[in-house]
Amino acid sequence: MAKSGIYLGCFILILIQNMVAANPLFNRNNVQELENLKDLIHQLEERVAVNEEPEVYPESEDMKMDAEEEDAGISPGALRQSEENLLMNIVDRIAPESPLRSRFRDLAGLAKTAKSFNSCFGTRMDRIGSWSGLGCNSLKNGTKKKIFGN
């Protein structure tokens, strides 16, 4: 009876092993999915940016015609003044960054933070662990490090 209980306990432990195993959050597949998500966010941000951007030079055709007509009688001082006015109008027309764009940038930044912590303890602990051979990434490319000279 005791033997069957031990065998049954071992069998249950083997079955439950997959459920209890560690599943790192930022493994290769998840990082790749985050990169794909980042690309999609950038594409969406570009589309939103095209729809939101105000017209920077709305009167460019009128300005060309005026420039051709007044080309003969413009003084350099008046030309500088008109350029300064044009630059000030452009600055006034450019809208500040919208909350939607900042959200997209925040979401895109998640992939960067995920890459920096792609192991068990983070980059600093990986460096410490790689020297001692006890870290999460001590077994890379199928080669084993020897801790002691055995």
Swiss-Prot record:
InterPro entries per record: Natr_peptide, Natr_peptide_CS, Natriuretic_peptide, Natriuretic_peptide_atrial
Segments of this protein annotated with the region Disordered: 52-75
Tissue: Heart ventricle, and to a lower extent in heart atrium.
Cited SMART domains: NAT_PEP (SM00183)
GO biological processes: blood vessel diameter maintenance; cGMP biosynthetic process; cGMP-mediated signaling; negative regulation of systemic arterial blood pressure; neuropeptide signaling pathway; receptor guanylyl cyclase signaling pathway
Pfam families membership: ANP (PF00212)
Disulphide bridges: 120-136
Cell location: Secreted
Superkingdom: Eukaryota
Coarse class of the protein's main subcellular location: secreted
Protein family per UniProt: Belongs to the natriuretic peptide family.
Role: Exhibits natriuretic and vasodepressor activity.
Record's protein name: Ventricular natriuretic peptide
Organism: Anguilla japonica
